[in-house]
Amino acid sequence: MPEQPPTIRPAESPNAELARLRAENAALRGQVGERAAQIEQLQQRIGELEARLAKDSHNSSKPPSSDPPFKKPPPRALRQPSGKKPGGQKDHPGATRTLVDDPEHTVVIPLSGHCECGRCLSAVAVEELPERRQVTDLVVRREVTEYRTVAGVCACGQVHRSIFPDGVDAPVQYGPGVAAFAVHLTHYQQLPYQRTADLLHTLAGIALAPATVYAMGREAAARLVAPVTAIGQALVQQAVAHADETGLRVAGALQWLHVLCTATLTFYAVHAKRGRDALAAIGLLACFRGVLVHDHWSAYAAYTCQHAFCNAHHLRELIAIAETDPGLTWPGRLIALLCEANEATHMARAAGFAALPGPMIEDLFTRYDEILTDAARYHPRRTGPPGSRRRVKQTPAYNLIARLRDHRDEVLRFITDLRVAFDNNQAERDIRMPKLKQKVSGGFRSEAGAKSFAIIRSYLSTLRKQSVDTYQALRMTFQGNPPMPRLG
């Protein structure tokens, strides 16, 4: 096939060629601009994903249990040396083992063997020496009490029969000690029902079905409704209270465990929702007029009480920002300021002061404002394209700065009111044991079981804070007389 001659483009005029090149240049510039915008978006997204991967319990609100097992624990940079020596401190109560005056068994060790002269030592007159040693052991055994009734005939001829005491209702049943021990294991020691039944059978030969253990918990919860209701009403009257919430698996679905607490009182409630509907249904915060310490969850802001925010959360967020951009100095300065203020409040309480000196408070507030003003220069507000009404996502640093600035009084409440703690660790500690229950058992099979757990745990946690024997309290509960916690 003959080769086709090349197509010859007619020559362009200089003006036409210039116009074409300008159009191509404009198109290429537009493409470069689009690519640059895409690169910027991708870099921003990569930064967000890297920051998300770098988050763990030391720089975010993630729990320590979510940290990778292969990751080395971070250094406790915020923990300052206390100056105390390791081990037990001077004048602490301790738990030294001491001899008891009335041992259950006494064993006198006889002489044995023969003397060098050949006489048998068993025939030698002896006297007890003052030295004695005691071995403490644990004996767990079943104790069965049998009740029998009697009948008698009065002189008038009327027949009388004795009656069984209250609580002895069946031919064979378990006493308050067994029920109290089972509930203590499931609701305080966090054992599952099956393992509780196994332990009772192993230790004491008492054969319980897991369903029986569950029924004992339901009975205890029914008997403790009044004391736990009183605990909730007492919390409403407190000057400072802590609140928190956490997810709970109930009947295969996500529900929420809410806690309201102080150093001496604890109230738990389970609800299907986390926010305002749940708090309204629980019904305590509507009557609360003190200072509520929490982690800035928006549902709490609807209540008219005073608020204080958890600064442990703020410290973790500041650490995350500092690690994301090591060149920034303001996160470290703000961390140092908050820790300095916290230390000042500890020293003031130890000295018996009712408040920090006014000049110190003013200085802390001034330095706080200066640091946030400086921080805002490095993290300006993001804006969208001209004419766009779409909300632009802001950086975590910008959001934190805005929150710390707009809610300065709530963040620094611990400075102006020494009754208020620096953080919300009280509520987080009270949340920890129910979370352990979920880790051990995987969740609750029914909503009734979860609510029973909340009632019993409220009671036991409160008694524990007040140094009351929780087992004996449960025993008295099954006897119909649950001890009332101190509510003042």
What kind of feature is each model-predicted range?
Residues 2-8, 12, 33, 40-41, ...:
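Catalytic center-proximal scaffold of phosphoryl-transfer enzymes
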